[in-house]
Amino acid sequence: MQLSTFSHSEDELLKKANWLAGFTLGEIAHQLNIDVPLDLRRDKGWVGQLIETALGAKAGSKPEQDFAHLGIELKTIPINHKGFPLETTFVSLAPLTQNTGITWQTSHVRHKLQKVLWIPVQGERHIPVAERHIGQPILWEPSCEQEQQLKNDWEELMEYIIFGRLNEINATLGEVLQLRPKGRNRRSLTAAVNQQGERVQSLPLGFYLRKQFTAEILQNFLRSPL
């Protein structure tokens, strides 16, 4: 299989993703001449970058989808031996300024989640990174119910941002979507607006999918008829 090449169609992309299933990260990294880190403590995004490279994705963390010409976003998801997600899934940065007039329909979150190619990967820490296996890909589009859940949470969380209630935001807000600091460290600051409408400095905030939500996606796939 020719990896790291442009996919002209959804079928072509899915063929590559299905071909990856069953290989270890080390085997794919070897094919791509990419070094495998001993652990992911300092290379948190390495697995995602490896799969992106293998499948020829281009966007990275930019607002557009990884396969914009196909309308598909790529997400790797670390799972345990029971197939349950080990961490929340980053979707996009939250707009802390210039957010007047943004609606769910025009939001980066909705754009990124319109169609997602999920790639489950073994993520338990006792398994050496190179020996972790890649799972079966899942091409997912949110159901009407799932989109409504996402919309409700997004609108609630954006209210906190638009009205400058940044100090009230915490990870318990939102049923399926949450807002959390997204930065390399506590010194990574960006512009925001407080309740008085004044420009202030804040930690960048990111929208994340809760583990229960992504677990439902994985479980629905396992239950679906082949």
Swiss-Prot record:
GO cellular component assignments? cytoplasm
Q: Return any one Pfam family short name.
A: MutH
Q: Note whether DNA damage occurs among the keywords.
A: yes
Q: Which domain of life does the protein's organism represent?
A: Bacteria
Q: Which InterPro entries match?
A: DNA_mismatch_repair_MutH, DNA_rep_MutH/RE_typeII_Sau3AI, DNA_rep_MutH/T2_RE_sf, Restrct_endonuc-II-like
Q: Which UniProt keywords apply?
A: Cytoplasm, DNA damage, DNA repair, Endonuclease, Hydrolase, Nuclease
Q: Where in the cell is it found?
A: Cytoplasm
Any one GO biological process? mismatch repair
MF terms (GO), sorted A to Z: DNA binding; endonuclease activity
Q: What functional role does this protein have? A: Sequence-specific endonuclease that cleaves unmethylated GATC sequences. It is involved in DNA mismatch repair.
- Tell me its family: Belongs to the MutH family.
Protein name according to UniProt: DNA mismatch repair protein MutH
Instruction: Tell me what organism the protein belongs to.
Output: Actinobacillus pleuropneumoniae serotype 5b (strain L20)
